[in-house]
Amino acid sequence: MENSRSDILLIGMPMSGKSTIGKALSEKIKYTFNDMDNIIEDKYKRTASNIFETLGEEQYRLYERECLEDFSGRDKLILSTGGGAINDKSIEISLSFKYRIWLQASIEELIKRYVDDEKERPLLYNTNNMEVVLTDLYRTRETFYMNCSNIVMNTSSKTINQITDELITKIDELN
């Protein structure tokens, strides 16, 4: 994976594995891992849910775009985005990352992961029908993910190690 620049952007739905895979991949290839939501929370001294509640989703998306701009073009960096970070206002800057990996998982898998991790995500969805919410979000975001990514990886029914090994192979194939 030797290149003049080798930044990696991880995109996909909430619970598709962006943070988990990003951390594991960074350990294997010795890149710096950054989580967009954590960066925004640290920078603005507020939780993501508080920003959404008080300033609105549009403001949060602006913060995400700033984060993409700040981290684009860095060498040996992995940036895990929020699920909605790739949109009509950010797609252009997203394309400046060398490797843009779309982590996919079925809606059923996303729901299972949410149930398994609900204590960590209590404010993620305020709904009685998560399947409908996730399906609607996916339909809204799928085109952006597709147009942004140059690597697609299904994360359902695979171990973290299998996913990271497959990603390293796919990255090497692009070189």
Explain the meaning of each model-derived region.
Residues 27-38:
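Post-Walker A helix-loop "phosphate-sensing" segment adjacent to the P-loop in P-loop NTPases
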Residues 19:
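Walker A/P-loop
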Residues 13:
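P-loop (Walker A) phosphate-binding loop of NTP-binding proteins
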Residues 36-93, 120, 135:
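ATP-dependent small-molecule kinase phosphotransfer cores
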Residues 97-142:
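A glycine- and Lys/Arg-enriched "phosphate-lid" helix/loop adjacent to the NTP-binding pocket
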Residues 10:
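Hydrophobic anchor at the beta1->P-loop junction of P-loop NTPases
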Residues 16:
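ATP-binding Walker
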Residues 1-5, 24, 28, 112, ...:
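NTP-dependent small-molecule kinase module
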